[in-house]
């Protein structure tokens, strides 16, 4: 039955439903029979509703003439599942049915959507990932193991992978366990044909083996555990077995293994015997690690830097900027920055030890990350020669290293906590009692041996120069001055014991000093030069005039900066001023936020330098 004819019949008499139609309303009997409600099935009713979907008023009138059960059957057929709307009345059901019929053409019934989803699921392929949670690389259909993290021989991976225990092919990128490569002779490790090289187990091409050997020796040299030392030496000896070109390296390995076996027995059973012993407790531990160092140096002489894995990185220049009794300031620079990212330096590790000590601690004193190049090492002993080793490193590992020697200044004071002043040997600096003859006759001796201990550069200050400095101090201390209407706060210092009398007669006296008398003395103390101080004062004054800081902060800041600021604080202030010079508002906020706490704390400079006439002392 055509939908158009049904629509025309319904519009002819809107009060007559399909069940009330008689034969007089139609011209042909076929149309009469098909319009009767008993003859129309669910699919024909759906076609009729879809034909009237563009005419919602006529469709609503037609649906109102049908029973609730007939409408429910059409809704269930449209949705593709059985539903029971017991709580909805007939008008609401008609509204839901019209909404279902008026859906866009792309939205078919739920059954159609379900079938399309099943087809999509069947079309989606599954991706096989590596079982290693740290890798999770996608594997091909023909891959039996992950070439990214698994061994190409045993096809297993390590949960905590140590790259020094793996052999990697430069051609195909495959890798294998070092132990797996040593078990089979067909990979060429220790053969006469390949001296210092090995065959890749995956592609068969030969690769360098000395880089892996150097890693074993380096770990053995730096480790503190006996089990690690034994294991790495055993691997280093196996990697060079049968060699003729590197016979001297093998002899050093044999000697180290022989000495170690004298303490722990055969290396095959070291794990059960020694467990996790300490290398320093072995009688041969230090000597064995020295042999490892000699083996690494011998390899560097034989193999060119391009062939060695630990090729030297950028050239370093290490110089000592300031030496005091208990600290030293070191600057490390890279002269020739490397263009390749592989050898690009990330930072430097500083290891400081006494020259008489044979070995350096495995933990560095400090680490300097670029672009920072200056570092201070604290806690040194006065009048002692030290050896400083600087090692450059990047993400791959250590690159280059350099050593120099220096000697700290003498500290004649009784208190070990005070640092040495660069102008006098006394621990109390220029604040010591000038009436004592010992203070007037002290000489300054400053020595530093640079460049691997080749030469000692010694500077001497005569007694006359020191005496002139003390004479200037006497003139300064007799005068008192006020800073912006307020007296300078008296800062008590530690006591000096008078050495001329038995029983230690201790005297203290208070004094106040003018800041305008000798500004250059304080400038030498905290590292603020005349030009730098003038530039900072002008900048702070400009900040006050533009309203970025108030008068109170300006007074406190300039007093603190010129009298109590340390070398590091002075350097930070200079960096802030140079960086935020074009943005004075940000500069003012940064200075207030960074130095407010330091300004309020009434401490003196902690760099060991006591400015003349500034550190006030009481004498009884």
Curated annotation (Swiss-Prot):
Gene3D superfamilies: Immunoglobulins
Zinc finger (PHD-type): 148-206
Main location class: nucleus
Domain Fibronectin type-III: 314-412
Cited Pfam families: Fn3_VIN3 (PF23376), PHD_Oberon (PF07227), VIN3_C (PF23380)
Keyword Transcription attributed: yes
Up-regulation conditions: By cold. Expressed only after a duration of cold exposure that is effective for vernalization. Strongly down-regulated after return to a warm growth temperature.
Keyword Secreted on entry: no
Listed Polar residues bias regions: 418-435
Region described as VIN3-Interacting Domain (VID): 512-620
SUPFAM superfamilies documented for this protein: Fibronectin type III (SSF49265)
Motif interval(s): Nuclear localization signal: 213-220, 493-500
Keywords: DNA-binding, Metal-binding, Nucleus, Repressor, Stress response, Transcription, Transcription regulation, Zinc, Zinc-finger
GO biological process: cellular response to cold; negative regulation of gene expression, epigenetic; response to cold; response to hypoxia; vernalization response
General function of this protein: Plays a central role in vernalization by mediating the initial transcriptional repression of the homeotic gene FLC, a floral repressor, after a cold treatment. However, due to its transient expression, it cannot maintain repression of FLC, which is then maintained by Polycomb Group complexes containing VRN2 throughout development. Required to deacetylate histones on the FLC promoter. Together with VIL1, required during vernalization for the modifications of FLC and FLM chromatin that are associated with an epigenetically silenced state (e.g.
PANTHER family: PROTEIN VERNALIZATION INSENSITIVE 3, VIN3-LIKE PROTEIN 2-RELATED
Protein name from the UniProt record: Protein VERNALIZATION INSENSITIVE 3
Organism: Arabidopsis thaliana (Mouse-ear cress)
Chain's gene name: VIN3
């Amino acid at each position: 039955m055509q939908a158009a004819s049904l629509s025309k019949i319904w519009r002819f008499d809107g009060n007559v439903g399909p069940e009330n139609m008689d034969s007089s309303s139609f011209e042909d009997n076929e149309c009469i029979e098909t319009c009767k409600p008993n003859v129309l099935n669910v699919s024909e009713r759906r076609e009729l509703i879809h034909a009237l979907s563009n005419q919602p008023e006529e469709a609503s009138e037609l649906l109102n003439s049908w029973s609730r059960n007939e409408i429910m059957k059409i809704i269930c057929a449209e949705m593709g599942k059985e539903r029971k709307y017991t709580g909805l009345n007939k008008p609401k059901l008609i509204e839901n049915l019209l909404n279902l019929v008026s859906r866009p053409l792309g939205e078919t019934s739920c059954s159609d959507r379900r079938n399309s989803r099943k087809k999509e699921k069947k079309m989606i392929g599954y991706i096989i990932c590596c079982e290693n949670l740290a890798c999770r690389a996608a594997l091909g259909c023909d891959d039996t193991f992950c070439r990214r993290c698994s061994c190409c021989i045993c096809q297993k991976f390590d949960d905590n992978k140590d790259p020094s225990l793996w052999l990697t092919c430069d051609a195909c990128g495959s890798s294998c366990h070092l132990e797996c490569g040593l078990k089979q002779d067909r990979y060429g490790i220790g053969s006469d044909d390949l001296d210092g090289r090995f065959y890749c187990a995956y592609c068969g091409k030969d690769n360098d083996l000395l880089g892996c050997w150097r890693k074993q020796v380096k770990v053995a040299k730096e480790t503190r555990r006996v089990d690690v030392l034994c294991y790495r030496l055993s691997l280093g000896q196996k990697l060079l077995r049968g060699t003729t070109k590197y016979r001297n390296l093998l002899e050093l390995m044999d000697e180290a293994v022989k000495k170690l076996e004298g303490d722990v027995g055969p290396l095959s059973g070291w794990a059960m015997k020694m467990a996790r012993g300490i290398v320093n407790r072995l009688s041969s531990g230090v000597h064995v690690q020295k042999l490892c160092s000699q083996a690494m140096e011998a390899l560097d002489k034989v193999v060119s830097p391009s062939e060695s894995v630990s090729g030297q990185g950028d050239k370093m220049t290490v110089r000592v900027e300031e030496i005091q009794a208990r600290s030293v300031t070191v600057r490390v620079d890279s002269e020739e920055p490397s263009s390749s990212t592989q050898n690009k330096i990330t930072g430097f590790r500083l290891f400081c030890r006494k020259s008489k000590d044979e070995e350096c601690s495995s933990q560095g004193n400090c680490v300097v990350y670029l672009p920072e190049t200056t570092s201070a090492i604290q806690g040194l002993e006065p009048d002692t020669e030290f050896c400083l080793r600087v090692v450059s490193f990047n993400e791959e590992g250590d690159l280059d290293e350099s050593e120099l020697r220096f000697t700290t200044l003498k500290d004649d004071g009784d208190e070990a906590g005070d640092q040495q002043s660069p102008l006098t040997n006394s621990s109390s600096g220029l604040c010591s009692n000038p009436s004592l003859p010992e203070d007037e006759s002290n000489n300054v001796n400053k020595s530093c041996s640079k460049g691997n201990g080749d030469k000692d550069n010694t500077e001497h200050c005569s007694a006359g120069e020191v005496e002139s400095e003390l004479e200037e101090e006497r003139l300064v201390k007799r005068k008192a001055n006020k800073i912006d209407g307020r007296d300078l706060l008296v800062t008590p210092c530690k006591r000096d014991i008078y050495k001329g009398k038995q029983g230690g007669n201790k005297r203290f006296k208070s004094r106040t000093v003018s800041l305008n008398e000798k500004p250059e003395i304080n400038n030498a103390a905290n590292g603020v030069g005349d030009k730098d101080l003038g530039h900072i004062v002008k900048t702070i004054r400009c900040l006050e005039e533009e309203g970025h800081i108030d008068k109170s902060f300006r007074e406190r800041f300039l007093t603190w900066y010129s009298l109590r600021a340390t070398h590091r604080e002075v350097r930070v202030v200079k960096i802030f001023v140079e960086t935020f010079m074009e943005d004075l508002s940000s500069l003012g906020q940064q200075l207030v936020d960074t130095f407010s706490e330091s300004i309020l704390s009434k401490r003196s400079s902690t760099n060991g330098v006591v400015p003349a006439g500034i550190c006030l002392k009481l004498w009884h």
